[in-house]
Amino acid sequence: MEPEVRNNPQESRYELIVESEVVGVAEYRREGDTLVFPHTQIKSSFRGQGMGARLVQAALDDVRAGGGRVVPRCWYVAEFIDANPSYRDLLAA
């Protein structure tokens, strides 16, 4: 089954779902149109499979679609943006 990423605004996080199980989260705090990402986590049995990148990419794509900006406090989100320059325009000034 293909992993799915969904925004769960009640929990202030994006969730990576595999076979109905939450296997990863990218937590955020909303500050107006900006989302601050302080923490990202992938279940240990799913690490090393590109799941973190899928989660962060989908979260950033969703922020872009909504016209928002991001502050990457989480090292993984910061490194993802650094490695993928097409997302640098999302960085809040």
Please place each PLM-identified region on the residue numbering.
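C-terminal structural segments of small proteins and small subunits
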Residues: 61-93
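General beta-strand recognition
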Residues: 15, 34-36
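Conserved beta-hairpin
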Residues: 13-23
